[in-house]
Design a protein with these regions (language model features):
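Extracellular "spike/adhesin" assembly and maturation modules
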Residues: 1-37
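Acidic, glycine/polar-enriched metal-coordinating patches/loops
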Residues: 73, 77-85, 101-141, 210-227
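Glycine-rich, compositionally biased intrinsically disordered regions
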Residues: 37-113, 197-198
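Noncatalytic modules at the cell exterior or secretory-pathway interfaces
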Residues: 125-139, 185, 234-252
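Beta-sandwich interaction modules
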Residues: 223-239
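Beta-rich globular "head" domains
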Residues: 62-64, 87-99, 144-218, 257-265
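Glycine-rich, low-complexity segments
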Residues: 30, 34-57, 111-169
């Protein structure tokens, strides 16, 4: 559809025929379709936060756009506190809003959003608001989310202090702290070298092989064995939620810990 201007319509006394009526009305329909397409691509997300492990506070937004049956609708949302029930342990959940009979209902599901992160995959009645994860006891990880970026109130441990970390790139999954649709993870890296010589601890996005990129990994210097180094960094993630890590030198007394502090779409 095209956004054509100006619109010329029949005036009093003008002949009304296919040429004078169809053309301006087709242009008007085209403009309406353009505006509708733009509305569908406008993702208005509310702020989300959970601090007590059971409730999610959802902020207000000027409109939620989704279908009710086969009809597209837009409705303002004043915000609310939602308490999801029946949460399983160590599971990703997705929060949705649904327009029904003039009001908005909130629900959660293990069904992920579509590739546009706009509605539930395969069901446009459910508008995607964000995601959350439970720990090993079914408690919601405390988090704050806005504009597609989520930060945890406490870091999610992915790799505890491990002895003798590898000196070659080794896979580690971020699935415990990063949802499948995420593009970036915010990491807290803690390193402790074996010897008294400073060395590098490294993380990298798996699969980056482009020629001319040197170094491929993000490298952070950790000092002598009496001093641990801690660093915060963003890193790109692939759809498998897997990155790689290693030490330059390593050794039996070396330590490496990796925590997720947040993620971004």
């Amino acid at each position: 559809a095209t956004f054509s201007t100006p619109l010329t319509v029949p005036d009093d006394g003008d002949a009304c025929n296919a040429a004078s009526v169809e053309t301006p009305f087709q242009s008007l329909v085209n403009q309406t379709q353009v505006l509708f397409n733009g509305l569908l691509n406008l993702k208005v997300r509310p702020s989300l936060r959970s601090v007590n492990g059971t409730d999610i506070v959802i902020g207000a937004v000027p409109m939620i756009v989704g279908t009710e049956g086969a009809t597209w609708k837009a409705l303002a949302y004043a915000g609310s506190t939602y308490t999801p029930a029946g949460l399983a342990n160590s599971t990703w959940y997705y929060l949705y809003a649904r327009i029904a009979t003039g009001s908005i209902a909130i629900s959660h599901s293990t069904t992920s959003p579509d590739s546009y992160l706009r509605t539930m995959n395969g069901n446009t009645d459910y508008v995607f608001l964000g995601s959350f994860r439970t720990d090993g006891s079914g408690v919601i990880y405390p988090f704050f989310s806005r504009d597609g970026e989520t930060m945890y109130a406490a870091s999610v441990a992915i790799l505890a202090f491990s002895s003798a970390p590898p000196t070659v790139a080794t896979d580690v999954s971020l699935a415990g702290g990063v949802p499948p649709y995420s593009q970036k993870a915010y990491l807290n890296l803690i390193g402790h070298p074996d010897t008294g010589v400073a060395e590098g601890m490294n993380v990298k996005t798996k699969g980056v092989t482009a020629a001319g990129i040197s170094p491929v990994a993000l490298s952070f210097t950790v000092n002598d064995k009496n001093d641990s180094g801690a660093n915060l960094t963003w890193i790109q993630t692939d759809t498998s939620q897997t990155i790689q890590y290693y030490f330059d030198v390593g050794g039996g007394a070396s330590r490496f810990a990796l925590h997720v502090r947040g993620y971004s779409e």
